[in-house]
Amino acid sequence: MLKTNVYDMSGKLVGEIELSEAVFGIEPNQAVVHDVVKNHLANCRQGTQSALTRAEVSGGGRKPWRQKGTGRARQGSTRAPQWTHGGIVFAPKPRDYSYTLNKKSRRLALKSALSAKAAEAAIIVIDEIKMEAPKTAKFAAFLNAVGATGKTLVVTATPDANVVKSGRNIPGCEVTFANVINVYDIVNASKLVLDKAALATIEEVFA
């Protein structure tokens, strides 16, 4: 049975909670996690790179010099790749790098990432993450109080503008929501801070 402590935003211990074995207690599958992280990064690529081939560079229609008799190497165009201002050989063009992975793999990877964090004791559960107003200093003090140092992923059950604004200017801090949590963000973080409502949502969806 997996259990972890529950804290309030001041860092005070207020109880403990049981974690679902199906989500936080499986044997992590590192190969699937690797595949899903690669997929996430590929899907994030803009793919807008572009350069001109010799056919697309303007000019170069006239032969620079006659074919024979000059003693120089034969040339057909000043826009050939070996010329300054010439086209690019195999010039990169805009392309879509995204690809899909099956749902089973994505779910297994997420549970593997969460289980790995649980095994490292890197999950911090908060009773409720709530900010009355956007206050970066107050939010930073909260993270410090609960021991969330370094790269931290804060997960709430629903979007909260005050929480997002409070955390977005803290280096290494990322705020996300339980329904859009992804493997890359979990793997990239040193600590995972989530409130009880977010934990319930994750367990309901993935258990």
What do the PLM-derived regions correspond to, one by one?
Residues 54-90:
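Glycine/serine-rich anion-binding loops at beta->alpha junctions
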Residues 31-68:
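A short, flexible low-complexity segment enriched in Lys/Arg and Gly/Pro that occurs
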Residues 1-46, 91-207:
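Extended polybasic, low-complexity segments that bind anionic RNA or targeting/receptor surfaces
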